[in-house]
Amino acid sequence: WVLALPGQWIAGVGVLVRSITMATEPVVDAGSGMNPETFTAAVAKLDPHGRRFTSLVPAQLARLLGDPRSLVALQSFDRILVGGQAAGRELIAAARAAGVSVTTTYGGTETAGGVVWDGVPIGDTSAAMVDGRIHLRGSSLADGYLDDAERGAVAFPTLDDGLRWYRTDDAGRFADDGRLVVTGRLDDTIVSGGIKLDLLEVAAVLRGMPEAGDVAVVAIDDARWGQAPAAVVTGTVDEASARDALVAALGPAASGLRVVHAGSVPRTPTGKVDRVAVAALFG
């Protein structure tokens, strides 16, 4: 296994545990932030005759696919687990078309990592939908949160079936073939001016504007609208143009849009958008 994620994160712990279970020594990508050069160097240290595995977040996968050296390294793996954030269908399709064996995973710290692979619960995991919210159950569930019984009671309710479940913050549905489809975070839906607005749709519209560049959207409190979408962009699009495009596509709920320009979108060490840092840009 190649450890390309922080070892203190549940996905990183998963890599270490799996490596130990397989009686192998993990190779640690010790670069200052994972990049194609350090990843390729780490892969070169693997046993050339052994099976190869790693876990990545989508942002890492996208970056590695774009470099010829790391693409060859990716192609050498038997399986690459991709999780930690929503992986777009286009990214997964591009990876598979390039000969990279990827498996999408879904879960969290509360489930000891990914427990749904390519939409199918693994082991004794079960998935259920309650009012559009994904719930997960299985032997890997956490007992609760340290010194926070109240939070644990909310996150791990006993449902009508008498069983204990983990109540996620994600919306989803089951596809016709029974696979679980994660459609977004429930906190990605806000009420702005009395109208519901999906921040994922806001981001999608902005990303469709070539002059927007990289985009991240969060919700901020607004005296007029209650809540408003706030976007950090790396391109040159101005706030008025972005607002006009959003209102045309999504309606008046997008009228409160705020935009700030930045050299890059703030991200966590694993490549997720740092929502707290993005919101801080708006004071």
Where is each model-derived feature located?
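AMP-binding/adenylate-forming catalytic core of the ANL superfamily
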Residues: 138, 163-164, 171-254
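A structural signal for short hydrophobic beta-strand segments in well-ordered beta-sheet cores
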Residues: 127-129, 153-156, 170-174, 217
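Conserved ATP/PPi-binding loop(s) of AMP-dependent carboxylate-activating enzymes
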Residues: 121, 130-158, 197
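Phosphopantetheine-dependent thiolation modules in NRPS/PKS and related acyl-activating systems
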Residues: 273-283
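AMP-binding/adenylate-forming
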Residues: 2-63, 103
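AMP-binding/adenylate-forming catalytic domain of the ANL superfamily
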Residues: 251-273
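Gly/Ser/Thr-rich phosphate-binding loop
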Residues: 66-119
